[in-house]
A protein has these predicted regions:
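N-terminal auxiliary segments of SAM/dcSAM-dependent transferases
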Residues: 2-100
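Active-site-adjacent beta-strand anchor residues
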Residues: 8, 45, 116, 168, ...
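Alpha-helical structural signal in soluble globular domains
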Residues: 41, 58, 156, 160, ...
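A short helix-to-beta-strand connector/capping loop
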Residues: 61-62, 86, 103, 163, ...
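SAM-dependent Rossmann-like transferase core, predominantly class I methyltransferases
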Residues: 74-137
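Nucleotide donor/acceptor-binding cores
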Residues: 105, 140-141, 233
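Conserved SAM/SAH cofactor-binding pocket of Class I
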Residues: 113, 117-197, 201-202
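S-adenosylmethionine
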Residues: 132, 136, 170-276
Length: 276
């Protein structure tokens, strides 16, 4: 399965509008770049050929097919390790990982990977929320990761003590990338598959459900996902724009979740709620 990148130039003033236009795209696959002193905005969307071709047809721009070398950009300088609540560290190169005093709590994701490295507000907040709850989870707890992307949340769940993790994504490209990352991190408890977030009948019930999905898909898939959440389990969600968080929280509460605790970072929101 090949990865493609759609690119378009715009202005910084249009950033919010572009977030809304691209609301149906996994937020981990959307990168918006600005430069100091410039009012320009560069938009990148990573995905399959059909997705990027549709964007090109609807909005112009250009589409490029990415080689594996470009996708992971292994020539990029490694960044400093990212610490998550002092319980996880995300490394960008094997040399840095080798020096970690707690390798069992360390995650390797290559520097320059196109998406899903833990830098995006949606992923970073999910990781923090997961770190916060895991000390109090029952022994042998399990997780379901909906919209896994690069697999970072599933890998984090195993590193934090999950006995089993099921992770899926609708995009086969994401599953290919996540399989490579799971292998690189020597994870043995993660089962990956291509699946639709609105058709989750095959998955087992879990103590934690992670859903890094755009708001419309999150609302549509929540009834099925919550059926997979055990009583007293935790639902962690992200990928929601600040302008849409009230609607998402209302939908989740109508399905029986407690009022979510919401964390806002810039334009993005994440939340956590418990199932009674």
């Amino acid at each position: 399965m090949n990865m493609f990148r759609w690119t378009r130039q715009s202005t910084e003033a249009m950033e919010e509008i572009w977030h809304l236009r691209l609301a149906t795209i996994d937020p981990e696959c959307v990168v918006m770049l600005t430069r100091p002193g410039s009012k320009g905005l560069t938009i990148h969307v990573f995905g399959d050929q059909k997705t990027t071709a549709t964007l090109n047809k609807d909005f112009g721009g250009k589409v490029a097919r990415l080689s594996k070398e470009i996708l992971t950009n292994n020539s990029q300088q490694p960044r400093a390790a990212i610490s998550i609540r002092g319980r996880l560290r995300i490394h960008s190169d094997p040399a840095s990982l080798a020096g970690d005093p707690q390798p069992e709590r360390a995650i390797l994701l290559p520097a320059g990977m196109a998406f899903g490295t833990g830098d995006h507000a949606t992923t970073a907040t999910c990781l923090r929320l997961l770190c916060d709850i895991t000390p109090n989870l029952p022994s042998g707890w399990t997780a379901l990761d909906a919209g896994t992307g690069t697999g970072i949340l599933a890998i984090a769940a195993e590193k934090l003590g999950a006995a089993a993790v099921e992770a899926f994504d609708f995009d086969p490209v994401c599953i290919r990338v996540s399989k490579e990352n799971v292998h690189a991190n020597r994870c043995k408890k993660i089962a990956l598959s291509v699946a639709d977030a609105q058709r989750v009948g095959k998955f087992q019930k879990a103590d934690v459900v992670l859903a890094n999905l755009y708001s419309e898909l999150l609302i549509a898939s929540a009834p099925g996902l919550l059926k997979k959440l055990r009583s007293d389990g935790w639902f962690i969600f992200s990928g929601v724009l600040k302008t849409q968080i009230a609607e998402v929280c209302a939908a989740l509460q109508n399905l029986g979740l407690a009022k979510p605790k919401v964390v806002t970072r810039g334009k993005w929101c994440a939340g956590i709620a418990r199932k009674s």
